[in-house]
Amino acid sequence: MGLPRLVCAFLFAACCCCRSATGVPGEEKQPTPTPDPVEVEVGNTALLKCGPAHPSGNFSQVEWFLIHKERQIPIFRVHQGKGQSEPGEYEHRLSLHGPGATLALSQVTPHDDRMFLCKSKQPRPQDHYVQLQVYKAPEEPTIQANVLGIHVDIQELKEVATCVGRNGYPIPQVIWYKNGRPLQEEENRVHIQSSQTVESSGLYTLKSVLSARLVKEDKDAQFYCELSYRLPSGNRMKESKEVTVPVLYPAEKVWVEVEPVGLLKEGDHVKIRCLTDGNPQPHFTINKKNPSTEEMEEESTDENGLLSLEPAQKHHSGVYQCQSLDLETTVMLSSDPLELLVNYVSDVQVDPTAPEVQEGDSLTLTCKAESNQDLEFEWLRDKTGQLLGKGPILQLNNVKREAGGRYLCVASVPSVPGLNRTRRVSVGIFGSPWMAAKERKVWAQENAMLNLSCEASGHPQPTISWNINGSATEWNPDPQTVVSTLNVLVTPELLETGAECTASNSLGSNTTVIILKLVTLTTLTPDSSQTTGLSTPTVSPHSRANSTSTEKKLPQQESKGVVIVAVIVCTLVLAVLGATLYYFYKKGKLPCGRSGKQEITLPPTRKSEFVVEVKSDKLPEEMALLQGSNGDKRAPGDQGEKYIDLRH
């Protein structure tokens, strides 16, 4: 090879090297441009734009590609403003959106979080990349606490709670909180371990486990987790509910607790329990000091270690103490002694226990009781509740027979509300029987059963006898009163003779006369709208003989025809009066108005017609009310519900 050829070859090689080093316009390698991000939520429609806005003519021929593993997979073509999907996974979800080459991707899923490429060939070849970013908010986080508890003496980390956030995209971030403060990883104190699972839908399920060492002060701590995630609209977060974790620690102190709190009295439902500052509560025993031996003796409790005093009595008073045994540490703890006081009032006694006195004499009643507190006494009349006096002594002077009966002595403790005891005593006033009524009238229906009653009082308590046969029953409202009820058949003889009840005791006797009045049943006329009968009454008055008693009078019966005749007569009188006034008016003898006679045109007179209709729903016995006390008839307007139609 000659020298000229070597020189030429050298120059050619140098030119090639220089071209390669310096580059030639139009032949340099273009770097991949930064893709345009498009954010969309799962289930919505994403709009993929092919670069900046240009006239529609610039996109007469466009191709869309999916970038998958550095390969360009065609998915859509645009030619002359018309689009066509390529077969594949996007075949049925892509469409043109408006003029140009903007694609609408419907029903976005997490699998669509990819890079897309738009290639346009006019006016010059141009590539435009779009990065589709898909988001989905996770569900509300759930949290599960450790229910078995964590012992403070264990040195290794124990699981506190587990937080789960389901169906989010992309993977949310989890933050743990204790009492509102975020927890950070801390060696030998706090550890957070998170894992995620990809569901078939492409969504993520996040699981985070919080482990920690707890101390006694964490027994009331509130733990919860927070999920932080992003949406196209911005950053969001969701919090779980708060949970507490049982913290186990040994007891250091034990004490006695009594319910109810405050002053106790006999009859209360009292509960005694033992408590400690440890968790869980250890096994307890409740002991009470024996006042005789001064030794503590164990009391019987239920399965929960509760001692129930139901009802509390004065012998339940005393000194109580709790003891606890920690089975893990075998440490025995004892509480401070607690003195329980059950306030009481002993059985009330009245002296004399069965007082008896002659009418007109005086009587002194004395009430006694015992209590651990100061007492107050009150005297009441049992029958009426009337307060007779205060103090342990009740003095009754110049007693009357009405003073006989039961009295109450109430012994109470003012300092302990509701603590009182009562004693009843019956006072007997010597005397012959006295009757509730000397004479009574009872309405009866013949051949019907009737109850006759008789009441008498006295001391000694009287007995009652009847002068007629029947079934008698007795009861005693108080120790010196007796009430007898006799069930008899009303016969004509009984209506004629009546009945007598006699009360007698060792001091005398007394009688009540019962007069029977016959009640007749009256039926309304057939045109009446109702038919009413009068039932036989049972009369049992209890008014005293010296009081004014009012006997019920049955209305007298009167024929309904008399009422109708009275109405017709009154109607005729009114008609005649009206005709007379009209006659004087026509003759001009009756001035009309202040200006004298005025002409009034009346319709032609017709033959007078009187139509009288009387309607009444009154009972026959109520019709007797139409009759005055002197036998005069009342005006028709007072005779109940009726109307009169007068036609002229």
Curated annotation (Swiss-Prot):
Sequence ranges of Basic and acidic residues compositional bias: 631-648
Organism expressing this protein natively: Rattus norvegicus
Disulfide feature: 50-118, 163-225, 274-322, 367-409, 454-501
UniProt lineage: Eukaryota, Metazoa, Chordata, Craniata, Vertebrata
Protein origin, superkingdom: Eukaryota
Extracellular side: 24-560
GO biological process: angiogenesis; glomerular filtration; positive regulation of cell migration; vascular wound healing
Keyword Nucleotide-binding carried by entry: no
PROSITE patterns according to UniProt: IG_LIKE
Protein name (database record): Cell surface glycoprotein MUC18
